C-alpha cells in the first residue's frame, strides 16, 4: 500500500476536505493522518472518508494535535519525561490517537517513544560531516562522547517507555491496531538500534507491537557512521510494520522527495516486505512539481501505480 502523509499540507489548510483534495490531485488515494493536525480539520477528513473519497492507512501520534500546543510538535509530551503528569498526558494523547485510528478503520499508529535528556551532540557530528570532517579526530571524540554518555543514562528512560507502551497496547490490541515504534534521526532519541532490537524481543508475543522504518532518519545515522542502512534493514525485516519514505541530502537534510538525495531505494527495497504501508512523508517545502516527477520515477522503477492502491 502506498500512502501520503498529511504533514505535507495540513498546516496551510483550514478545511480537511480541501487538504485531502490537494493530495488526491497528486494521484494518491490513501493518506496517513499525521501529527500536527488541527482538530478543526477532522470533520472534513471524516466527510472524505465516509464518502469514500479517501482511504486512511494509519495515524501518526499525536493526532489530533493537543489543543494547548499551537505548533506542530510531536514530542511536546514524552513517555520518558521526568514529570509524571507529562508522561500521563503523553499516554492519554496516544489513547486518543488510537481512537482516531479506529474512526477511520486505520491499521496502525506511528509512535515516538521519547528521548534521553542530555546535551545534543548529533548536530555537532552533522556539522563536522557537512564540512568533510567525518573522519577527523574531533569527529571521533564527539561521537564516542555521545555513545558513552547515552549508554550510561539510558536504562531509566527505556523502562519509562516500556511502562507507557504497556498501558496503550491494551487498547491497540483490542482493536487490532499496530503500534509502529519509529526509528529516530538523532542518537539522543529513543530507542537507538540496540534498544529497538531489545524492544522487539520484549514484545515478541505482542503482535501489534513492531518496528516503523523511517528511511530518512536511518540514512542520517548511516551518514554519521552510526549504522549501515542496508544491514539494519536486513536485521529488522521480520519486525517492520511500515515505512516513512523520504530522501536525504548529505548529511542531514531529510524529508526530500525520493531520488533527490543519497538513498539507494532500489537496493534497500529488496529488504522491505511487500504487504506493508509505504508512506510518503515530505516537507511542506516540497513542490507539487517535485513530487509528481519523483512519483513518476518511482512508478517506473517499482511498477507501482498509486491510483490503483488496494
Feature map (PLM): residue ranges:
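Active-site acidic/histidine proton-transfer and metal-coordination neighborhood
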Residues: 79-210
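Glycine-rich, proline-tolerant flexible connector loops at the mouths of alpha/beta enzymes
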Residues: 33-55, 119-120
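Short glycine-enriched loops at secondary-structure junctions
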Residues: 7-11, 60-67, 114-116
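N-terminal substrate-binding region of glycoside hydrolase catalytic domains
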Residues: 20-41, 71
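Short catalytic-loop micro-motif centered on adjacent basic/acidic residues
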Residues: 29-35, 180-182, 280
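Residue-level detector of anion-binding/catalytic polar loops
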Residues: 29-30, 55, 107, 178, ...
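Histidine-acidic metal/acid-base catalytic patches
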Residues: 1-24, 39, 50-52, 96-110, ...
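Flexible loop residues that form catalytic
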Residues: 36, 62-64, 114, 248, ...
Amino acid at each position: 500500500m502506498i500512502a501520503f502523509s498529511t504533514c505535507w499540507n495540513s498546516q496551510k489548510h483550514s478545511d480537511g476536505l480541501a487538504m485531502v483534495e490537494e493530495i488526491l490531485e497528486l494521484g494518491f488515494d490513501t493518506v496517513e493522518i499525521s501529527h500536527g493536525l488541527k482538530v478543526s480539520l477532522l470533520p472534513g477528513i471524516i466527510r472524505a472518508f465516509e464518502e469514500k473519497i479517501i482511504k486512511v492507512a494509519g495515524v501518526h501520534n499525536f493526532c489530533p494535535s493537543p489543543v494547548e500546543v499551537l505548533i506542530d510538535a510531536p514530542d511536546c509530551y514524552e513517555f520518558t519525561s521526568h514529570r509524571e503528569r507529562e508522561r500521563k498526558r503523553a499516554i492519554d494523547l496516544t489513547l486518543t490517537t488510537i481512537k482516531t485510528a479506529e474512526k477511520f478503520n486505520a491499521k496502525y499508529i506511528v509512535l515516538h517513544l521519547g528521548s534521553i535528556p542530555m546535551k545534543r551532540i548529533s548536530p555537532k557530528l552533522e556539522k563536522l560531516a557537512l564540512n568533510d570532517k567525518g573522519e577527523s579526530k574531533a569527529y571521533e571524540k564527539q561521537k564516542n562522547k555521545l555513545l558513552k554518555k547515552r549508554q550510561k543514562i539510558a536504562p531509566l528512560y527505556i523502562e519509562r517507555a516500556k511502562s507507557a507502551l504497556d498501558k496503550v497496547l491494551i487498547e491497540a490490541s483490542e482493536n487490532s491496531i499496530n503500534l509502529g515504534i519509529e526509528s529516530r534521526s538523532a542518537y539522543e532519541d529513543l530507542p537507538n538500534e540496540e534498544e529497538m532490537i531489545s524492544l522487539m524481543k520484549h514484545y515478541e508475543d505482542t503482535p501489534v507491537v513492531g518496528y516503523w522504518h523511517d528511511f530518512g532518519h536511518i540514512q542520517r545515522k548511516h551518514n554519521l557512521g552510526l549504522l549501515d542502512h542496508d544491514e539494519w534493514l536486513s536485521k529488522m525485516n521480520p519486525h517492520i510494520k511500515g515505512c516513512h519514505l523520504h530522501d536525504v541530502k548529505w548529511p542531514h537534510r531529510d524529508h526530500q522527495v525520493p531520488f533527490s538525495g543519497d538513498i539507494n531505494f532500489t537496493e534497500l527495497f529488496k529488504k522491505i516486505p511487500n504487504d506493508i504501508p509505504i508512506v510518503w512523508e515530505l516537507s511542506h517545502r516540497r513542490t507539487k512539481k517535485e513530487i509528481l516527477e519523483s512519483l513518476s520515477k518511482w512508478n517506473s522503477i517499482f511498477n507501482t501505480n498509486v491510483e490503483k492502491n488496494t
